[in-house]
């Protein structure tokens, strides 16, 4: 059986869709955000199911049926992501933020440029990186620049102002508000 660290090791070997030009001077570290790709989330669900079933054999069938049901939702979500990418106008996405969607982008065939290649300690982005992102947005006529749901939008707003791109939030599926939690919002809805 795979465990989370084995999944992480295997997935980090796949690093084909990173746009090195935006962050050439930064070293790329592993990304612990496995859950951002539905295919990885399925593996995590199966690990949880197996562990729970191992420790609570009486309810193994219950855990199995719940995992199967949730994995069907994850498969549908994965399908919808792939459809959007297949029918989209571009495969390049710009993030004026820390990038935590490596596994999702690798899975669905998107390429990214970001102010930071991974979730590093927040600091002002490098000028050459910002200039590069602005150039890519203009050259490719990208209408949107993304930021994460919990990050202040300062960098994104500055780049948007210079390029005319709109700022949108890309939810990384690990933060919910109290209201969302009380309403039962989960990974699938985010």
Regions found by a protein language model. Give the residues of each.
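Extracytoplasmic metal-acquisition and chelation regions
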Residues: 1-190
């Amino acid at each position: 059986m795979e465990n989370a660290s084995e999944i992480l090791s295997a997935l980090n070997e796949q690093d084909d869709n990173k746009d090195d030009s935006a962050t050439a001077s930064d070293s790329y570290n592993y990304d612990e955000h496995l859950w951002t790709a539905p295919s990885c989330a399925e593996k995590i669900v199966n690990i949880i199911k197996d562990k729970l079933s191992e420790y609570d054999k009486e309810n193994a069938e219950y855990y199995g049926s719940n995992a199967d049901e949730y994995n069907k939702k994850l498969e549908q979500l994965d399908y919808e992501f792939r459809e959007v990418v297949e029918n989209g106008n571009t495969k390049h996405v710009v993030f004026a933020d820390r990038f935590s969607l490596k596994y999702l982008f690798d899975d669905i065939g998107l390429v990214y440029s970001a102010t930071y290649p991974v979730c590093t300690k927040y600091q002002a982005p490098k000028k050459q990186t910002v200039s590069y992102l602005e150039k890519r947005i203009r050259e490719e006529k990208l209408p949107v620049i993304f930021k994460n749901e919990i990050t202040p939008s300062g960098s994104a707003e500055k780049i948007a102002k210079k390029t005319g791109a709109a700022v949108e939030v890309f939810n990384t599926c690990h933060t919910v508000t109290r209201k969302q939690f009380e309403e039962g919002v989960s990974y699938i809805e985010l």
